[in-house]
From Swiss-Prot:
Cellular component aspect of the GO annotation: extracellular region; GABA-ergic synapse
Glycosylation, residue list: N72, N133, N143, N149
The protein's name in its UniProt record: Neurexophilin-4
InterPro entries documented for this protein: Nxph, NXPH/NXPE
Coiled-coil parts of chain: none
Annotated spans, V (Cys-rich): 225-308
Protein's organism: Homo sapiens
A molecular-function term among this protein's GO annotations: signaling receptor binding
Region III, annotated ranges: 85-163
Length: 308
C-alpha cells in the first residue's frame, strides 16, 4: 500500500496538470499571447496576457497572421475619412470607349488589273473605304515598266466602257475637284523598251508624253459637267517614284537598253452621292491601250470585286 501514492500521481498527474493550466488561461475564440520576458516594475505577473497587436494600417486589430487581410474595413474607413486621414486607394481603369468606328467595306485589291507582256508590265491596285458618315476614301497605287499615261477616275455606274475619243488630239481641260486622274504622271520618261538609250533624243520623251497625256486626260481623266456636280473629292495624299533600270536590248543583246519603272500612290476623300460608285481605269502606251471599269457592290461584302 506504500506504492499507492506513486501510482496515483503517475496515472492522474497529467490530468491534474491540464486542469491547473486551463484554470489560469481562460478560453477565448482569439489566440492569446503570453509574456515570455521578465515582468518589469509595476507590471503584472509572468504569464499575464498581452494586448493583441494592431495592424500597420491603423484599421483595427490584426488577425492571427500578419499577411491575413481584414475582411471588412467599412467602419474603419468611415472613421478615418471623418478624421481626414483616408488612405490612398487604387484607381480602377475604365475600359476605353471608341466614339466612332470606320466601317471598312473592302480590303486591298477592290479594283485591280495586271498586264504582263514581253515588253512591259503593269499593275494597278486600289481599295475603297466607307466612313459611314457620308464620305468614302479611294486608295490607289500602280507599278509600271513602260512609257505611257495612266488615268484613274470615279464615275457613276452609267459610264460606258469604250475607247472612243482616246486618240483624238485636243487641249487638256481645266482639272476639276472631282478629277481622280494621274494626268502627266508618266510624261517625258524616255523611249520605250527595245530602243537603245544612246539613240534617244532629248525631245522624244517630252513630245510623246505630252501628246499622250492631253487626249487621254481630256477623254477619260476629267468627268463631265453633270458628273462634276455629283462628285466632290479632294486629294489627301499623292506620291510618285521613278527609277531607270538597264538591261540588254531585245532586238540586239549586245546593246544596252533601259526601262522606266514608275510607282505612284494616291488617296482621295470624296462625298458619296450614289449607292454604287465605279472606278474607271485607263492606260495608254506605244503599243498597248486598256480601259476598265470596276463597280464594287456596297450591299454585298465579297472578297472578289465585280468587274464591269
Amino acid at each position: 500500500m506504500r506504492l499507492l501514492p506513486e501510482w496515483f500521481l503517475l496515472l492522474f498527474g497529467p490530468w491534474l496538470l491540464r486542469k491547473a493550466v486551463s484554470a489560469q488561461i481562460p478560453e477565448s475564440g482569439r489566440p492569446q499571447y503570453l509574456g515570455l520576458r521578465p515582468a518589469a516594475a509595476g507590471a503584472g505577473a509572468p504569464g499575464q496576457q498581452l494586448p493583441e497587436p494592431r495592424s500597420s494600417d491603423g484599421l483595427g486589430v490584426g488577425r492571427a497572421w500578419s499577411w491575413a487581410w481584414p475582411t471588412n474595413h467599412t467602419g474603419a474607413l468611415a472613421r478615418a475619412g471623418a478624421a481626414g486621414a483616408l488612405p490612398a486607394q487604387r484607381t480602377k481603369r475604365k475600359p476605353s470607349i471608341k466614339a466612332a468606328r470606320a466601317k471598312k467595306i473592302f480590303g486591298w485589291g477592290d479594283f485591280y488589273f495586271r498586264v504582263h507582256t514581253l515588253k512591259f508590265s503593269l499593275l494597278v491596285t486600289g481599295k475603297i473605304v466607307d466612313h459611314v458618315n457620308g464620305t468614302f476614301s479611294v486608295y490607289f497605287r500602280h507599278n509600271s515598266s513602260s512609257l505611257g499615261n495612266l488615268s484613274v477616275s470615279i464615275v457613276p455606274p452609267s459610264k460606258r466602257v469604250e475607247f472612243g475619243g482616246v486618240w483624238l488630239p485636243g487641249p487638256v481641260p481645266h482639272p476639276l475637284q472631282s478629277t481622280l486622274a494621274l494626268e502627266g504622271v508618266l510624261p517625258g520618261l524616255g523611249p520605250p523598251l527595245g530602243m537603245a538609250a544612246a539613240a534617244a533624243g532629248p525631245g522624244l520623251g517630252g513630245s510623246l508624253g505630252g501628246a499622250l497625256a492631253g487626249p487621254l486626260g481630256g477623254a477619260l481623266g476629267v468627268p463631265g459637267a453633270k458628273e462634276s456636280r455629283a462628285f466632290n473629292c479632294h486629294v489627301e495624299y499623292e506620291k510618285t517614284n521613278r527609277a531607270r533600270k538597264h538591261r540588254p536590248c531585245l532586238y540586239d543583246p549586245s546593246q544596252v537598253c533601259f526601262t522606266e519603272h514608275t510607282q505612284s500612290q494616291a488617296a482621295w476623300l470624296c462625298a458619296k452621292p450614289f449607292k454604287v460608285i465605279c472606278i474607271f481605269v485607263s492606260f495608254l502606251s506605244f503599243d498597248y491601250k486598256l480601259v476598265q471599269k470596276v463597280c464594287p457592290d456596297y450591299n454585298f461584302q465579297s472578297e472578289h470585286p465585280y468587274f464591269g
